[in-house]
Amino acid sequence: MNVDKKQIEIKGKKIAYLDYGEGDVILMLHGNPSSSHLWRNIAPTLSKIGRVVIPDLIGMGDSEKLEGENNPGYSFNGHYEFIDEFCSELNLDNIHLVIHDWGSALGFRLAREHSEKIKSISFMEAIVRPM
């Protein structure tokens, strides 16, 4: 299945993402370093049961890079701010999180901050921060 990547501007930077299917949102967050490409084999199947949304995290995949390797936008909090605003801009609700590696820590925080929007969490090779 070929799906064209879309782009949205978040905090003045372009975030690339895939968005296809209908129904409850299945938000898939990749690890570091990686990209939405990680989910290429499972996403088409999941799109038959829901709306699959897969961003390339800031600085990864086809998303825009930040200036300077020590840019605070690459910190955990910086990454989280991009994901949080991404979800707000796309009005994501009824979210099933599918999270991996670095994306798991971001997803767990998203679940903590917006528990009313999260329906389920599936995680792999997770990084767990204190709640």
Model segments located where?
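Alpha/beta-hydrolase fold catalytic core
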Residues: 1-26, 47-51, 68-70, 74, ...
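Active-site donor-binding loop signature of nucleotide-sugar glycosyltransferases
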Residues: 10, 57, 126
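Conserved HGGG/HGGXW glycine-rich cap/lid loop of the alpha/beta-hydrolase fold
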Residues: 13, 18-65, 86
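Nucleotide-sugar-dependent glycosyltransferase donor-binding/catalytic pocket residues
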Residues: 34, 72, 129
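Short, hydrophobic alpha-helix immediately C-terminal to the catalytic nucleophile
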Residues: 40, 84, 108-112
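Residues in and immediately flanking transmembrane alpha helices
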Residues: 43, 69, 113-114
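Active-site loop/oxyanion-hole signature of alpha/beta-hydrolase fold enzymes
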Residues: 54-99
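Conserved hydrolase catalytic core segment
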Residues: 93-131
